[in-house]
Amino acid sequence: CGMVSTANYIGPVDDTDIFFSPDRIKAQLIWFTSGALEWRITKHSVTMPLKEMLISFEACSEVPCHRNDHKSDITMWINDVEVGTWTSPGDFGERRGQLNPPFWPLKNTQYGIWTSWRIDDKGTFFNGRQISSVTMQQLNIPSHPYISLKIGVKKDAKNVGGINLFGE
């Protein structure tokens, strides 16, 4: 596991304490093998009832250095409801990512796939294709004090291939 900013590594690699570092907010790339990251999103500016959620991010699998054919099952949960799983086809390298800092070695992961997740009254969709029947109503957003968004890799997934998350 690890994380980097635009300027340097944030703490030592393979030390989970970095996830509690105040510098974590500077991360531009986060990687780990299994587990999940959680974001707690305020509902103060949300008009209820919420009809749909759109969540987008760049991600790929994780393996030391990179391997373009290294699959990983990446799952999303909202308010602890599993909304769907996407199988990333690989951990991509060999050409420099557009926003990677100069210190980041070319042998490492360079870029991911832009993913778009939509949850509405018909189900959950990944890049326009339905991946589950979980709807907005099942997320029970009005009864929670915030919206919990988790992205990760289950320890018992078919393809436990880690995750790289790119961006702010």
Label the predicted regions.
Residues 1-106:
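Mid-protein regulatory/catalytic core that forms ligand/cofactor-binding pockets
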Residues 44-47, 141, 157:
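Hydrophobic beta-strand core residues of beta-sandwich domains
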Residues 50-52, 142-148:
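Extracellular Ig-like/FN3 beta-sandwich strand-entry sites
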Residues 65-69, 95-97, 128-136, 165-167:
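Low-complexity, polar-biased intrinsically disordered regions enriched in Pro/Ser/Thr/Gly
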Residues 107-142:
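Beta-sandwich interaction modules
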Residues 116-122, 150-158:
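Short beta-strand-plus-loop segments that form exposed binding edges in beta-rich domains
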Residues 154-168:
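Proprotein-processing/basic-patch segments
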